[in-house]
């Protein structure tokens, strides 16, 4: 099987990239990083600044879309990120389906938290 990062790029319909040097920008609103550590591979996307309101933070961290997607803070603690764990997923169709679902969730999160931060 080809490199999983190459499969992710194909699934997203973007040119192959050097994942050590670049992030992936989709539609000028979603920035995705591919993180490889040993045999594991994750997609990371910061989707909003860390909420100041504790209820918004609790809400964000309580969301759970699947066993593969989790929400957390970044290493610096300034942003909420969505992480997709693709470890152990080897078939192109499975990578594609999981990646597409992840992108749809990230877009929803960005919209949801933009509204919450404005008090809607």
UniProtKB/Swiss-Prot annotation:
Molecular chaperone required for IpgD stabilization and secretion. Belongs to the IpgE/SigE chaperone family. It comes from Shigella flexneri. This is Chaperone protein IpgE. The keyword Amino-acid biosynthesis does not apply. Keywords: Chaperone, Cytoplasm, Plasmid, Virulence. Transmembrane segments: none annotated. The keyword Chaperone applies.
């Amino acid at each position: 099987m080809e490199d999983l990062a190459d499969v992710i790029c194909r699934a997203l319909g973007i040119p192959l990239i050097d994942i050590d040097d670049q992030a992936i920008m989709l539609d000028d609103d979603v920035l995705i990083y591919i993180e490889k550590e040993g045999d594991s591979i994750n997609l990371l996307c910061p989707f909003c600044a860390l909420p100041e309101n504790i209820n918004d933070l609790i809400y964000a961290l309580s969301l759970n879309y699947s066993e593969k997607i989790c929400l957390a803070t970044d290493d610096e603690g300034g942003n909420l990120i969505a992480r997709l764990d693709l470890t152990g997923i080897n078939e192109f169709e499975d990578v594609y389906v999981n990646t597409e679902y992840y992108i749809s969730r990230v877009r929803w999160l960005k919209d949801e938290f933009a509204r919450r931060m404005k008090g809607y």
